Regions:
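Bacterial N-terminal signal peptides
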Residues: 6-14
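Short tryptophan-centered beta-strand motifs in secreted/extracellular beta-sheet-rich domains
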Residues: 128-130, 223-232, 236-238
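Short, aromatic/His-centered strand-loop micro-motif at the edge of beta-sheets
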Residues: 189-226
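Positively charged n-region of N-terminal signal peptides that target proteins for export
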Residues: 1-4
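Short strand-turn-strand beta-turns centered on an Asx-Gly dipeptide
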Residues: 239-244
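Ligand-recognition surfaces built from glycine- and aromatic
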Residues: 33-41, 46, 50, 125-127, ...
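Bacterial Sec-dependent N-terminal signal peptides
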Residues: 15-31
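Secretory/extracellular carbohydrate-interaction modules
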Residues: 69-73, 78-195
């Protein structure tokens, strides 16, 4: 019996040894903790802190922007971070845009890909929602951290409005600017300087000014947070983390209804200090219109 057991054991060990000798080497399984961001860029163009030959900042529109992950021009400023599943927007002072002295790596909504001419009004409504963080940002000479704009709603004149007030371009003020500022989120909107201004006068940028601004109570620091912007006729709402909300629905929003608008998102660094920089990470970003 002892001989039989030893023989059986020998056969088992021999078979196991043959299996190990002949088997293909095992490929280690690497668990992917994060997937790359699924952000649809089909209706966005991006402005980069890179000057063109005419001095204006470089812009990349659809469909070229869809290749950002392999585009040598875009890669330094807009790239995937597979360690946390984000789309990174990197900016530093280099090339400013019209009506601003600051640089940006910022998305601009295009309802018709490749064109700035199709936009929306408050009456038509819109929604933008994103989850993001600001993990890195520089400080000034006093040690205070710089700030950056992470979301906007920008106004735009129609061609008829532009011609009516004899402007050279279609630019109108941003009705909404959302800042990351010293670890907190600050919201600023525009208000009319004169509520009795005529329908023609309110088309001018000079007719509007910033309100005092409001901070959400939560301190986000460098951690992730979610922002949602909800627009309807005469009303603007900004929500953070589905727990706190600012609503603007007074006369200023009613008057704003004359403008066209478009959403913006990314990293609009609010300084021209040498060696300044910021990285903003978006984990998701969605826009929709009724």
């Amino acid at each position: 019996m002892r001989f039989l057991l030893l023989s059986v054991c020998a056969l088992i060990l021999s078979a196991a040894s043959c299996k190990e000798d002949n088997a293909e080497p095992e490929i280690p399984v690497i668990e992917r903790r994060f997937t790359l961001p699924e952000i649809d860029l089909s209706n966005w163009k991006v402005t980069l802190p890179v000057p063109r030959s005419d001095g204006k900042p470089l812009e990349v529109e659809p469909p070229e922007i869809l290749d950002y992950a392999t585009d040598d021009t875009l890669l330094p400023f807009m790239y995937n971070d597979s360690t946390d599943g984000s789309l990174v927007f990197y900016a530093y002072p280099e090339s400013s845009t019209t009506n601003s002295s600051y640089s940006r790596t910022e998305l601009r909504e295009q309802m018709e890909p490749g064109s700035n001419n199709a936009n929306w009004t408050f009456g038509q409504g819109g929604n933008m929602k994103g989850t993001l963080s600001v993990p890195e940002i520089s400080s000034d000479s006093d040690g205070d951290r710089h700030r950056t704009i992470i979301m906007q709603i920008h106004g735009r004149l129609t061609n008829e409005q532009r011609d009516l007030i004899q402007e050279d371009d279609n630019n109108a003020p941003p009705i909404l600017k959302i800042y990351w500022q010293d670890g907190r989120i600050r919201v600023k909107t525009k208000v009319l300087k004169d509520l009795n201004a005529s329908d023609t006068e309110i088309l001018r940028t000079s007719a509007w000014e910033d309100d005092e601004g409001r901070y959400f109570s939560e301190v986000v620091g460098t951690e992730q947070f979610t922002l949602e912007v909800i627009v309807s006729a005469g009303r603007l709402e900004v929500k953070m983390n589905d727990s706190e909300s600012f609503v603007y629905d007074g006369i200023h929003m009613e008057k704003w209804g004359v403008f066209e608008n478009y959403f913006k998102a990314g990293n609009y660094l609010q300084t021209s200090d040498a060696n300044a920089f910021a990285r903003v990470k978006y984990y998701d970003l969605d826009i929709s219109h009724d």
